[in-house]
Curated annotation (Swiss-Prot):
Signal peptide: none annotated. The lineage of its organism: Bacteria, Bacillati, Bacillota, Bacillota incertae sedis, Caldicellulosiruptorales. Catalyzes the folate-dependent formation of 5-methyl-uridine at position 54 (M-5-U54) in all tRNAs. Its EC number is 2.1.1.74. This is Methylenetetrahydrofolate--tRNA-(uracil-5-)-methyltransferase TrmFO. It comes from Caldicellulosiruptor saccharolyticus (strain ATCC 43494 / DSM 8903 / Tp8T 6331).
Length: 435
C-alpha cells in the first residue's frame, strides 16, 4: 500500500506524516530545488514564505486553540515550531530556516516516506492521492486540476472583503434594511454624513497598502478593483459605487444618508458579516484604523481582513466532501491553501485531516469528520458548505458552532475559553480513537 502526496509544504508534510502513523508508505513529490514558485526561496520543506509568526498561543485566540487541536493529532508542524521557536511574547514565532530544516530532516528520515524531487503535471486518477500544491500551483498542474474539478470551480486570485463579528457592531448607529425596502432586511447599513464620508475617504486614499509583487501586477485589471484604488479615481466614485445610498432610508433621520456602507451575512447563523465591495490591499493595521471610522464599526472586531493576492484554489463547497476528497474521485484528496483555507496553521491542519482520511480510505475504514464545534472542524465545515461567493477563510471563533448555553455567556474571554475546553475534549476523544 502506498499513497502519493503532491507538494511538501505545510499541508503536504502533515499529510505524509499522518499517513505513516497508519504504517502506510508515502511517495512525496516536491519540485524544489529543481523548480521554484515565484514566492519560494529555500530548498527545504514547509517553507514559511511570509511572516515567521504562527500567531497567538492563547486559547482566547482561535489560532491558539488550533495549535492545541493540532498537537492532539500529532502535528509535525507544531513539533517543529516548538523546537525552533524564537521569543515573541504571547505569539509562537519560529526561526524559519531551522523550522524548515527540522521538518525536512524528520520527513527524509522517515523510512516509510520516499521523497521524489520532480514537478508533477498530472494528478493520477487511479491512485490514492493528496494534492497539497499550495496557492502558487504550477500552470501545467492547474490545467489538470481544472479538468478534475471543472474549470469554473477553479479560482486564480483572492479578492476577499473584511469580515466583522456582528456582536461588535454598534446598532445605535447601524440598522438593518434592504434597498428600496425590497425583500427582507438582510443587510446591515452604516450611514454616513458628508463630513463622516469625507474624513473616511481621505484616510482611505492615503492609507498604506501592501506592496504588489511582480507576479500579481495583473490582478488589479481582473475586474475586481480594490476599494482604495477605486476611491482614487475621484471623491465621489465609491459613493456612486459600493457606498451608494440610493434606496436606503436611515430610520433615525427619515432621510437618505450621504453614503452607506453595507454588510452582508457571511454565515448561516448570522454571527459574521462581510463588508460589501470592500476588497482591499490595505495593510491589516490600516484596515482596522480606517474601517473603524465608519459609523457603527468604531469597535468592530475583524475576524478576517480583506485581501487581494494571487491564490489558486478550488471551489471546495462544490467539489469537496467533508472528508476533503473530491466528490467525483473519492480517492483524490485536497489539503492546504488550494482548498480555500487561509494561513499557515489552517493549511497544516487540513493536511492532517486529509492524510488521516486518505490512510483510512486505503485501509477500508470509515473516514473522519471533526464537528464544527472544533476549530479544525469549523474550518472544514466552512470550506465545504455551499455558499454564493466562496472566499478563503482563516481560523476564528466566529465560525465555530456554539450551543445556547455558551451563547448566553456575555463575557467574551470566558465564552472563548469554554468553547476551547469543549473543543479540545472532543478532539482528544477522536484522536484517541484514530491512533
Amino acid at each position: 500500500m502506498r499513497i502519493t502526496v503532491i507538494g511538501a509544504g505545510l499541508a503536504g508534510v502533515e499529510a505524509a506524516n499522518a499517513i505513516t502513523k497508519f504504517g502506510i508508505k508515502v511517495r512525496l513529490y516536491e519540485m524544489k530545488p529543481k523548480k521554484f514558485s515565484p514566492a519560494h526561496k529555500q530548498e527545504g520543506f514547509a517553507e514559511l514564505v511570509c511572516s515567521n509568526s504562527l500567531k497567538s498561543k492563547l486559547l482566547t485566540n482561535a489560532s491558539g486553540l488550533l495549535k492545541e487541536e493540532m498537537k492532539l493529532f500529532g502535528s509535525i508542524v507544531m513539533e517543529a515550531a516548538y523546537n525552533t521557536q524564537v521569543e515573541a511574547g504571547q505569539a509562537l514565532a519560529v526561526d524559519r530556516y531551522l523550522f524548515s530544516e527540522y521538518i525536512t530532516k524528520k520527513i527524509k528520515q522517515n523510512p516509510l516516506i520516499e521523497v521524489i524531487h520532480e514537478e508533477v503535471t498530472e494528478v493520477p486518477r487511479d491512485e490514492v492521492v493528496v494534492v497539497s500544491t499550495g496557492p502558487l500551483t504550477t500552470e501545467s498542474l492547474l490545467e489538470d486540476i481544472s479538468k478534475l474539478c471543472n474549470s469554473k470551480n477553479l479560482y486564480f486570485f483572492d479578492a476577499a472583503a473584511p469580515i466583522v463579528l456582528k456582536d461588535s457592531i454598534d446598532f445605535s448607529k447601524a440598522f438593518f434594511a434592504s434597498r428600496y425596502n425590497k425583500g427582507t432586511d438582510d443587510y446591515i447599513n452604516c450611514p454616513m454624513t458628508k463630513e463622516e464620508y469625507e474624513r473616511f475617504y481621505y484616510e482611505l486614499v492615503n492609507a498604506e497598502v501592501i506592496e504588489v509583487k511582480d507576479f500579481e501586477r495583473d490582478l488589479l485589471f481582473e475586474g475586481c478593483m480594490p476599494i482604495e484604488e477605486m476611491a482614487k479615481r475621484g471623491i465621489d466614485t465609491i459613493r456612486f459605487g459600493p457606498l451608494k445610498p440610493v434606496g436606503i432610508i436611515d430610520p433615525k433621520t427619515g432621510k437618505m444618508p450621504y453614503a452607506v456602507v453595507q454588510l452582508r451575512k457571511d454565515t448561516q447563523d448570522g454571527r459574521l458579516y462581510n463588508m460589501v465591495g470592500f476588497q482591499t490591499r490595505l495593510k491589516w493595521g490600516e484596515q482596522k484604523r480606517v474601517f473603524r471610522l465608519i459609523p457603527g464599526l468604531e469597535n468592530a472586531e475583524f475576524v478576517r481582513y480583506g485581501v487581494m493576492h494571487k491564490n489558486s484554489y478550488i471551489n471546495s463547497p462544490q467539489v469537496l466532501t467533508k472528508f476533503l476528497s473530491l466528490k467525483k474521485y473519492p480517492n483524490i484528496f485536497f489539503a492546504g491553501q488550494i482548498t480555500g483555507v487561509e494561513g499557515y496553521l489552517e493549511s497544516a491542519a487540513t493536511g492532517i485531516v486529509a492524510g488521516i482520511n486518505a490512510a483510512r480510505y486505503v485501509l477500508g475504514r470509515a473516514q473522519i469528520t471533526l464537528p464544527p464545534s472544533t476549530c479544525i472542524g469549523a474550518l472544514i465545515e466552512y470550506i465545504t458548505t455551499p455558499k454564493k461567493d466562496f472566499q478563503p477563510m482563516n481560523a476564528n471563533y466566529g465560525i465555530i458552532s456554539i450551543d445556547e448555553e455558551i451563547a448566553r455567556i456575555k463575557d467574551k474571554e470566558k465564552r472563548k475559553l469554554l468553547i476551547a475546553e469543549k473543543s479540545l475534549s472532543v478532539c482528544r476523544e477522536i484522536a484517541n480513537q484514530i491512533f
